[in-house]
Amino acid sequence: MNIICVFIFLIISLLLIVNFKCTFMVVSACSMVLGCMNGVGPFGMYQAVSIAAFSIFMLRYFYWKDMRTYPLLFSSILLIVSYVLSNHYAVYRHYGSLVSCIVVDVASLFVFYQIISKNSRYIFIYIRTCVILSLVVGVYTLVETIISSNHYMFIVNSLELYSQDIIVEDIRFGMKRAQAIFGMHTTLGGFSTMMAGLLLWVSLNCPLYVKKLGKKKLSIAIGLMIIAVFLTGTRSTIAGLAVVLMSFFSFKHVKMKYVFIAIVSVVIGFMALDAYLDKIILSFTDMESVGGSNTDMRSIQFELAALFMMQSPFLGNGISYTFEYVADKYKEMCGAESLWIPIMIDFGMLGITAIIVFIIQVGYYIKKYCEIRLLFFLLGILVFNSLSSIPAFSFTQLFYLFVIIAFLKKHQESICDSPSSFPSIK
């Protein structure tokens, strides 16, 4: 057990006790960074903090009546049932992992929704933290790419702060693949795609937030996140971002001067980055032209997933079976390149059904409370996570972004003032 990680956990736990709601918003925004870190005992940092936060929430703030208004109640129950039954009938039972899965994938979403629904001013804490983190991650991504080295990862690995001591040194599209402060480049890609989408929506729809956060800082953060997606050198991330950005296109608001500027920018971009863009386009049409995963490897992984799923088709083989047994026995399964592969093996048809119901309920929530165009946002992340794994990211946490957007759309003027003074961007 790393003493530095224990100290970080104790500090965060103390902040949760002193100022639960603000701290929970900051922790939620930083979940993918905390998810890379070692924590306490068998739990990673984000898992341990989430369990501590949920315990405090249940003791202080939980009311049974709140369950009735929760929009994801059915899919949450289905996910919990899937986890419990799969673990109970598994060959190897993991009760610690069962608790962390339920808390991180299901309970944390409920806590987040209750905090926002009862005082939507806490949204500003989340957004401000996202802007700060995006600026830090974006700037460091550029530094890492320019110097072709990641000194931060060397330091944290020497201190054994992260659960995986992976330093990505692959070359893709002629440049080192960036991972910034995350354990993997795909985690950086997932974070950058979601932050680009969320902050772009805020910049286009929330003038009060833009003024309070600072237009330049917000624009720089968005630009850095989009650039970071390309610097990861991950095709699935680029494809996911392309779909996410479709959420913001509307013929109704297109003006000829912007069309002209866009055309000129694209032409200049192709002229300046001709070789780089050629490599990206070629990588989609000829996956063997670059290193990394390809269609054959993914096909083998899905064939193996189907094979092991048939051992227990309805309930699956139990939590962590994919990475503790299958990946250990079959090298082709290392870093299972899809959201669906571990679900198929670990949780079977019940788990697949639970995730599909979750996606449908989130889609309905977007249609009812956000904008129907934002279904492309959901689809973009689904495409990305279906093509690649995203370490330190739980797909269900995508719901955070749509809760934020829904309440911003409904209460923007009354929630621009933050109920707390941290963390400051000025």
Identify the residue ranges that each predicted region occupies:
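A membrane-periplasm/extracellular boundary helix in multi-pass inner-membrane enzymes
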Residues: V139-S149, T232, F249-S289, Q311
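Transmembrane alpha-helical segments and their membrane-water interfaces
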Residues: L10-L14, A53-W64, Y83-I146, F358-Q361, ...
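Hydrophobic transmembrane alpha-helices and their immediate junctions
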Residues: S203, K212-S219, A242-S250, M256-F260, ...
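Alpha-helical transmembrane segments of multi-pass inner-membrane proteins
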Residues: I12, I127-V156, I166-G174, A180-T232, ...
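A conserved mid-to-late transmembrane alpha helix and its immediate loop/hinge
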Residues: A180, M184-T186, I226, L315, ...
